[in-house]
């Protein structure tokens, strides 16, 4: 077994499917869909080639799951947080923290989607973009309350800019520990989203 495969051996509570999703996400982000083969994915996951088809119909189905599964989790968390937390500032802090931890823990969904969008059928692209927009709307609704000085287009621009900043952690991290990353990026994101214009 290769070193990479050993690193992705399923631990307690981790299924083969989860391992395939993780290694495929890393590979799709690094090489894009066209540069990744089923053999590459299975070797990195430490399973035989046919093993992938026990969990996914094909490589394309795996790509769709790589993007949709974490995106659905982000959207659900954002929706539940917005519903459960009455204070918008606290809700925003929770969303920022969760998003950063998600980016640190796995290849960011948005970057994977952007790099591999060309490989997806139109119906899948539309569905994924709709889910991304719904996730963003949860943030925009909260930021709009906290930033009455901004117009709706300005809030949208600001929110998506902060998303780009947070997602960049996956590719720009230069060896900082997780706590330092979370603290630095959370502070920057909250300040950007809540500071009145001119400050």
Predicted regions and their residues:
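Amphipathic C-terminal alpha-helical segment
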Residues: 102-105, 152-153, 159-179, 190-199
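Short, structured motif recognition centered on aromatic/hydrophobic residues
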Residues: 28, 74-75, 92-96, 112-114, ...
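Generic hydrophobic, amphipathic alpha-helix propensity
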Residues: 16-24, 41, 66-70, 74, ...
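Hydrophobic alpha-helical connector segments
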Residues: 65, 80-105
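Helix-turn-helix
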Residues: 2, 19, 23-61
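Amphipathic alpha-helical segments used for helix-helix packing
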Residues: 103-123, 171
């Amino acid at each position: 077994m290769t070193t990479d495969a050993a690193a992705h051996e399923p631990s307690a509570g981790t299924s083969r499917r989860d391992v395939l999703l993780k290694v495929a996400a890393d590979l799709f982000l690094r090489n894009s869909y066209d540069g990744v083969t089923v053999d590459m994915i299975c070797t990195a996951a430490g399973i035989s080639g046919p093993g992938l088809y026990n969990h996914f119909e094909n490589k394309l189905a795996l790509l769709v799951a790589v993007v949709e599964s974490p995106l659905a989790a982000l959207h659900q968390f954002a929706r539940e947080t917005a519903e459960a937390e009455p204070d918008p500032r606290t809700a925003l802090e929770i969303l920022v923290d969760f998003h950063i931890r998600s980016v640190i823990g796995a290849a960011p969904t948005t970057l994977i989607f952007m790099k591999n969008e060309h490989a997806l059928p139109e119906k899948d692209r539309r569905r994924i973009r709709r889910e991304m927009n719904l996730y963003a709307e949860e943030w925009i609704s909260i930021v709009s309350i906290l930033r009455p000085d901004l117009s709706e287009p300005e809030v949208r621009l600001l929110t998506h800019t902060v998303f780009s900043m947070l997602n960049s952690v996956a590719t720009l991290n230069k060896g900082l520990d997780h706590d330092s990353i979370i603290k630095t990026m959370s502070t920057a994101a909250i300040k950007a989203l809540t500071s009145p214009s001119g400050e």
